[in-house]
């Protein structure tokens, strides 16, 4: 696409891409792709070592967005039917919410490249693509996570029928746990799917299980996905 004249911009996290074959990046750059690594390690900024880019987004022409948990690696090549192929989900968005995704990408882009990407090529006029309202929330080490956390808590507190949560790394704080318990106690059906035996973080799995007791006692149903690593991050309320 870059050779054909399409403007292609790629951000990869410095730590997350530390094992990538540099020849692949060179090949992309030679074709005209602009590739930037997010927050490389430098001695004078060690306190920002944990400022990482964990977003997985693809925005096309500023009009179509894909967002979810899947990255660009062999784990996502198959159909989640083998241990080396992870189970995940991606979602396609159209309409004004895509501009919010684009803004999230460009926020990180300016931090790596210091060059603003603007104009109709990146922010075209977007009309509603349907009748379902959509809102994109974002978090970052600098901005914090309170917006996303607050929306999760409000949705859980507002639930009347059901809460279905998929989480690859589930170690909730006490307030979130209490909200789930109160939802179950008022009759909301709460179901949680987590990774099973096949996980990429045994430490997180053990920490997660330490949080299960009060949830199970309140009637929350917890399931472990068995076929392969479960990498979903998703919650559906009512």
Model feature map: region roles:
Residues 1-238:
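Charged, low-complexity intrinsically disordered terminal segments
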